[in-house]
Amino acid sequence: MPVITLKRSKKDELTHLEHIEEAAFAVNSRYFENGVLPPFSEEERTACTLAASFERDVAAVFSIYADNERVGGAVVQLLTHDEREIVLFFLAPSCQGKGVGQRALNAFEAEFPETKVWRLITPTQVLRNAVFYVNKCGYHIVQIDAYDKEKESGMFIFEKRKEI
């Protein structure tokens, strides 16, 4: 098993992170009519990009490393003093299904031990993600946003609550 570490990313690492993100999301593009993931308007997509995340005070961009090789990334946003949302989470396809994602999410919990509630969202078409978050990572589906024809998707909203 590789050693998983997290490092806060710098803006000059953006291009490398975007390449990994693109490959990671391409794996699921077959579930969407236009092959675009996430299936939102251009404005919403722009607001959720890695580049935009570097500009937000309440968000931190991370690189995920397996044995010192960058294999993924995430954007963690502070919601309240004890609640955070993982706005983006992605791994290189070569690392998916090998325990790296589960261990990376555990590393985020260790990085922010004061966080009592973790949230994340994934499209309803990507059931593999939902199964992973629920069965492997201990998240619970707390809401299902209905299918939106304009966005071509519904969304699962997950939470994981910790006792501190």
Descriptions of predicted regions:
Residues 61-63, 69-78, 85, 90:
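Conserved beta-strand in the GNAT
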Residues 5-19:
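A short beta-loop-alpha structural element at the N-terminal edge
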Residues 111-124:
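Conserved GNAT acetyl-CoA-binding A-motif
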Residues 121-125, 130, 134-156:
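Conserved catalytic-core motifs of GNAT/GCN5-like acyltransferases
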Residues 43-63, 72:
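A short helix-loop-beta-strand connector motif used in the catalytic cores of GNAT acetyltransferases and
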